[in-house]
A protein has these predicted regions:
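PAPS-dependent sulfotransferases, especially Golgi type II membrane carbohydrate sulfotransferases
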Residues: 1, 5-95, 225-240, 251, ...
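N-terminal signal-anchor transmembrane helix
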Residues: 93, 97-119, 149-152
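Glycine-rich phosphate-binding P-loop
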Residues: 119-138
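Short His-Asn-centered micro-motif
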Residues: 120-122, 262-266, 288, 354
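Post-Walker A helix-loop "phosphate-sensing" segment adjacent to the P-loop in P-loop NTPases
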Residues: 137-147
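PAPS-dependent sulfation machinery
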Residues: 149-261
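Flexible, glycine/threonine-enriched loop-and-boundary segments that flank and lead into catalytic domains
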Residues: 252, 257-281
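Conserved phosphate-donor/acceptor-positioning beta-strand/loop module used by diverse small-molecule
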Residues: 265, 275-300
C-alpha cells in the first residue's frame, strides 16, 4: 500500500481529526438536512415528473418554441403562442401525476376492448355532422368530448361527473369571444362538451398535429409538426398507445358500454396504416366531396381559426402560407386515394358522398347501420328525419367563395366514384 495512503489513514484515526471533520459536516441542526434536503427532494420529484411525463412530445414542443422565437410574426400573435407553450410546460408535473394516479387507482380501465369506427376523408365534408349525429346514438356508439380529449384523466373526469360540473364546463366555447372567434364558432361550433375529433388529443397533448399549425402558422413549420409517419416508429406507437388509453378511460365511464368507438380523424391520414395494424378489425367511413367545395370551405375556416388563435393575425399576409397549405392538402388527398385503393380492405371501408348526407341524413345513417350490422330503430329514424329538416333550413351565418384549386384530379375521380356508387 502507498506510504502516503498509510500516513493519511493513520492521521485520520487520531481523535482530533475526526472532531475537526465532524464540525465541518452538516448535522441534523443544519439547514441542508431541513430546508435544503426538502428542496433537494422537491427538485428531484419535479425533474422526475418531466422525465416521466406522458406529454408533450418534447421535440415538437421545442420546434414550436424555436419558430416562435426566430420567425417573424406580430407581437400579439407571439404572446398568444408563448401563453400556450407556458401552460403546456408548467402543467407537465400535474398531468404526469394525474396520468400515473389513473394507472394506480383505476387499473381496470386497461382491460376494456376498443372496436373503432374511424370517420376519415377530408375536412369540411360533413364529418362533424356525421360524427355528432352518430354519437347521439349512445346505445350503439361512444365518442370522446372535447373536455375528455383535453383532460384524459379519470382522476379529473370522475370528480367532474360526481359534482355535476360537466354541463357547466361543457358550455364553455373553445373559441375566443371576438369577432373572428364568433365567425370560427359559426363555421365549426366547438364547446367543451361537444364530441370532437381525435386531433384535439394529438394537438393538445403532443403538440404534433395539423391543428397545431393553426396556433403556430409558420409555413416552414407545417411539415415538421404535421407528418405523423415521419416520426420514429417507437414514438408513433407511444402516441397511439396513449391515444388508446385515453379512449379506454372514456369507455370506463360508460355504464352500458356501446359496441363501437366512434372516431373522427380527417386531417392525419398518414397514421391510418398503423391504426389498421393496431385495430385489424377497424371500420373506416370515408366521407368526401369535390375538392373545390371542401378546399374553399377549409381555407375560410383555417383563416378564421388561425386569426382567432393569434390575436387577429391574417395568415395570408405571409405569401408562403397558402401555397404551403395547398401543397399539404394535395398530398393528403393523394394519400387518401392510395389508402382507399391499396391499403384499406374493401369490406372494411364504406365510401360516402357528402351531398347525400346533407340531403338525406336518415338514409345515410341507415346505410351505415346496415353496413355495421346494427339495428336501425324507428325511433332513431324519426329523430333523424326531424334533424334532416332542421339541417335544410338552418342559417349557417357565413358564406364561402368557391375557388377551384388544381392538383386534386385523382381525388376528384374518387369522389365521382363514390357519388356514382350511391345512386340506386
Amino acid at each position: 500500500m502507498d506510504l502516503a495512503v498509510l500516513a493519511w489513514f493513520g492521521a485520520t484515526n487520531h481523535p482530533w481529526v475526526w472532531a475537526e471533520l465532524s464540525r465541518s459536516m452538516p448535522s441534523s441542526e443544519t439547514p441542508l438536512s431541513n430546508g435544503g434536503m426538502t428542496t433537494l427532494v422537491a427538485l428531484t420529484i419535479l425533474l422526475a415528473s418531466y422525465a416521466l411525463a406522458p406529454f408533450p412530445y418534447w421535440p415538437s414542443f421545442f420546434r414550436l418554441l424555436w419558430f416562435m422565437l426566430t420567425e417573424p410574426m406580430p407581437l400579439g400573435a407571439k404572446v398568444q403562442q408563448l401563453g400556450f407553450l407556458l401552460v403546456e410546460s408548467i402543467s407537465v408535473p400535474l398531468r404526469t401525476l394525474l396520468w400515473y394516479l389513473d394507472e394506480l387507482l383505476f387499473p381496470g380501465y386497461r382491460q376494456i376492448p376498443i372496436e373503432p369506427v374511424f370517420i376519415i376523408g377530408e375536412p369540411r365534408c360533413g364529418s362533424t355532422l356525421l360524427h355528432r349525429t352518430l354519437a347521439k346514438s349512445e346505445e350503439d356508439f361512444f365518442a370522446v368530448r372535447h373536455l375528455e380529449w383535453r383532460f384524459p384523466f379519470l382522476t379529473i373526469q370522475l370528480p367532474i361527473a360526481w359534482l355535476g360540473l360537466r354541463q357547466f364546463l361543457g358550455g364553455i366555447s373553445y373559441w375566443p369571444d371576438s369577432d373572428v372567434g364568433k365567425l370560427a364558432a359559426r363555421m365549426h361550433p366547438n364547446r367543451l362538451d361537444d364530441w370532437e375529433e381525435d386531433g384535439i388529443f394529438f394537438e393538445e397533448s403532443f403538440c404534433h398535429h395539423f391543428f397545431i399549425f393553426l396556433r403556430f402558422p409558420y409555413p416552414k413549420l407545417l411539415k415538421v409538426v404535421d407528418r405523423f409517419a415521419s416520426l420514429p416508429e417507437a414514438v408513433q406507437r407511444m402516441m397511439l398507445d396513449r391515444h388508446h388509453k385515453a379512449i379506454q378511460k372514456v369507455a370506463y365511464l360508460k355504464k352500458n358500454q356501446p359496441r363501437y368507438y366512434l372516431s373522427k380523424e380527417v386531417t392525419s391520414h398518414d397514421k391510418i396504416p398503423l391504426l389498421l395494424e393496431l385495430y385489424p378489425n377497424a371500420r373506416f367511413i370515408v366521407l368526401i366531396r369535390e375538392s373545390k367545395d371542401f378546399m374553399s370551405s377549409l381555407m375560410a375556416l383555417m383563416e378564421a381559426s388561425t386569426s382567432a388563435k393569434n390575436a387577429g393575425y391574417d395568415p395570408r399576409s405571409n405569401a408562403d402560407w397558402l401555397p404551403e397549405v395547398q401543397t399539404r392538402m394535395q398530398q393528403d388527398c393523394a394519400n387518401l386515394v392510395g389508402l382507399c385503393k391499396d391499403v384499406l380492405p374493401a369490406e372494411q371501408q364504406l365510401g360516402l358522398y357528402s351531398p347525400d348526407l346533407f340531403r338525406d341524413i336518415p338514409a345515410t345513417v341507415e346505410r351505415i347501420y346496415g353496413w355495421l350490422g346494427l339495428e336501425f330503430k324507428d325511433r332513431l329514424r324519426e329523430e333523424l328525419i326531424e334533424q334532416s329538416k332542421q339541417q335544410q333550413i338552418r342559417d349557417k351565418g357565413y358564406t364561402n367563395q368557391t375557388t377551384v384549386f388544381p392538383g386534386f384530379e385523382d381525388y376528384d375521380q374518387l369522389v365521382s366514384s363514390f357519388a356514382a356508387a350511391a345512386k340506386p
